Design a protein with these regions (language model features):
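Phosphate/NTP-binding elements of NTP-utilizing enzymes
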Residues: 75
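Active-site neighborhoods of divalent-metal-dependent phosphate/nucleic-acid chemistry enzymes
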Residues: 19, 24, 85-87, 99-144
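Short, structured coil segments at secondary-structure junctions
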Residues: 101, 151-152
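Short, well-structured N-terminal submotif of metal-dependent ribonuclease cores
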Residues: 1-67, 81-96, 137, 147, ...
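Alpha-helix capping/helix-boundary segments
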Residues: 36, 71, 112, 130, ...
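ABC-type ATPase nucleotide-binding domain
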Residues: 78
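Active-site regions of enzymes building and remodeling cell-envelope glycoconjugates
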Residues: 153-158
Length: 158
């Protein structure tokens, strides 16, 4: 028996927020780290099956992936120093990404900055802010970053 879709769970919510699996609703939403998003944007080579499945579900609008603003800023810096080639401006990259409503920008808040400052998986400020976003949303983080996985404060998917 396939999963039946629920309507929006709250005012303004999308029908992508949850699916029914048996008697319990299971959220189909994730937070992305920078590296897996860039792998997906460049064709998906190097993603694990589970991570690729999350992005595939998002592309099919069967899941939501939240993109922390720290991911966009890190992407900008990586492009600026030549470590990644977006093939276009960051603005065009973001416009293309967010043209699919299943990709949702997640704004940085003062609370996330405080959380990142108080508890971080390593010395990388982007990892700290991205993990703070996942903690704030209480959603799993798509990442293969070993220190984040070992940290254990954030559920990870890889």
């Amino acid at each position: 028996m396939g999963a039946a879709r629920l309507g929006p769970a709250r005012p303004g919510a999308s029908d992508l927020d949850q699916v029914v699996v048996g008697p319990v609703a299971e959220p189909k939403a994730y937070v992305t780290d920078t590296h897996p998003l860039l792998l997906h944007a460049s064709g998906g080579r190097g993603l694990s099956r589970r991570a690729a499945g999350c992005y595939k579900a998002c592309e099919e609008r069967a899941a939501i992936i939240y993109v922390p603003m720290a991911v966009l800023w890190e992407t900008s810096l990586l492009a600026r120093v030549g470590r990644v080639d977006l093939g276009r401006s960051l603005r065009a990259f973001a416009e293309d990404l967010f043209s699919n409503p299943a990709y949702q920008p997640f704004d940085l808040t003062a609370e996330q900055v405080s959380l990142a400052d108080e508890s971080r998986p390593n010395d990388d400020p982007f990892d700290a802010l991205i993990c703070a976003s996942a903690l704030d949303l209480q959603l799993p983080l798509i990442t293969r970053d070993g220190p984040i996985q070992e940290w254990g404060r954030v559920r990870t998917i890889w």
